[in-house]
Amino acid sequence: DELLPNLQYGFDYKMIEKNFRPILDDMIGEHNVTGCFLQRSIVPLNIHSDWENNPNEDTPGYAVLFPLQLDGDAHTIVFKETSHDKHPNDSNKITNYKFSNEDLKLLGHVPEFRLQRVSEPKKIKWVLGDAIVWKRAHFHCSDNFLTGDTKYKDSLVLFTTK
């Protein structure tokens, strides 16, 4: 499993809904939260979509990540491409996108096979108190935060449906 040795602790959204519903309503409009978890990342996550992480037949909406704590710099990187598959695969076209040297440094943990199938990386720096939002079908990943001074990063992640 690609998640290990990172940690996730899922819990019932009802425990925080009173405080978070108004924030989410302002950001993404009407929604249902179907996934709610705290996450500690100690290794960078590879390119994936969150489409498959859906417990019901509703259409996946957004992933909302709230950075909670980190000991250095970190980014979430969201790509132009979307998929209902978990990872880029042979069914995804090769994009021939030319990544910058900065991009390649941030994406140093990603195998070339996957990089060939994504383009136009949007690099979103983690800032405590901010929220990072993307459609769950979009391919995304963490940056290769271990190349800097960052040893861990903690977040609250919510998955929504329409």
Predicted regions and their residues:
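Non-heme Fe(II)/2-oxoglutarate
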Residues: 1-47, 82
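Catalytic core of non-heme Fe(II) oxygenases with the double-stranded beta-helix
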Residues: 42-138, 143-162
